[in-house]
């Protein structure tokens, strides 16, 4: 089974095919910093009937959803309470109708900022494969080394440029900050198989990842910005980066 994590990739494509449709299952997130949101949660996409049925049952206590009487439904196995509410689902459907407009705004704002930062010596960007169209919810750029990147990140914050993230020292999205996972700090029991797999994290060489993440700053692309606001932000980022370098 190929489980495709496309949580931050909604709207991205490769050779005309949407990201999230390459795996047996594609996963999307709808939390508040994703391309569209319905409060929390996400969605799983699949063309496999068995996977679809299993996912539908598993997220609702294992109910088989046969018939109209919930009290008469069978439970083929244990599941969890991961159901989305009708209110959240309604918000999600409304967001889907706005998706094309949201993507256009993000692309516009992304390209304005990138076009300005491209003129700064020492700033580079990730490579998108030929035939690929990326998701524009974040602009990721690289600086020559980790020390300079931390300096620039601090300077951006001190100069009022919000929503710029340095994941390398952030406890949110990088393995160095995941002591709870590496040391299996949990309120419950875990299987020996899971414990053995997690233990490998403490023995894994992440030096290549460190070399990339330590030089990366990610800036959120908001859809509420006007063109003028984006231009002002871009020029401010440019000035701060040049000053820090």
Mark where each language-model region is.
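Hydrophobic residues in beta-strands of the RecA-like P-loop NTPase core, especially within AAA+ ATPase
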Residues: 3-4
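Active-site region of PLP-dependent enzymes
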Residues: 9-17, 22-138
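Secondary-structure transition into beta-strands, especially the periplasmic turns and strand N-termini
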Residues: 49-50, 146-151
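Short amphipathic alpha-helices in soluble, non-transmembrane regions
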Residues: 55, 150-159, 233-238
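Conserved PLP cofactor-binding pocket of PLP-dependent enzymes
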Residues: 62-71, 112-117, 153-217
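Alpha-helical initiation/capping and key positions within long helical/coiled-coil segments
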Residues: 105, 211, 229-232
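Conserved PLP-binding active-site segment of the aspartate aminotransferase-like
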Residues: 127-129, 136-146, 166-184, 214-229
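C-terminal/domain-terminus segments
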Residues: 221-245
């Amino acid at each position: 089974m190929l489980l495709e994590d496309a949580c931050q990739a909604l709207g991205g494509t490769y050779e005309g095919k949407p990201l999230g449709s390459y795996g047996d299952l594609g996963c999307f997130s709808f939390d508040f910093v994703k391309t569209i949101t319905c409060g929390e949660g996400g969605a799983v996409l699949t063309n496999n009937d068995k996977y679809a049925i299993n996912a539908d049952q598993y997220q609702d206590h294992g109910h088989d959803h046969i018939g109209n009487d919930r009290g008469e439904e069978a439970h083929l196995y244990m599941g969890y309470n991961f159901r989305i509410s009708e209110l959240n689902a309604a918000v999600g459907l409304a967001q889907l109708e706005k998706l094309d407009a949201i993507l256009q705004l993000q692309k516009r704002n992304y390209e304005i900022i990138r076009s300005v930062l491209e003129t700064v010596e020492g700033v580079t960007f990730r490579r998108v494969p030929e035939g690929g169209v990326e998701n524009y919810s974040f602009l990721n750029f690289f600086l020559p080394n980790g020390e300079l990147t931390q300096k620039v990140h601090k300077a951006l914050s001190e100069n009022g440029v919000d929503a710029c993230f340095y994941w390398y020292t952030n406890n949110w999205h990088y393995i160095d900050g995941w002591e709870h996972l590496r040391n299996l700090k949990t309120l419950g029991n875990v299987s020996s198989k899971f414990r053995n797999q997690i233990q490998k994290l403490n023995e894994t060489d992440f030096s290549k990842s460190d070399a990339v993440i330590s030089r990366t700053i990610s800036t959120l692309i908001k859809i509420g910005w006007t063109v003028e606001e984006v231009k002002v932000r871009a020029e401010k980022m440019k000035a701060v980066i040049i000053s820090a370098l």
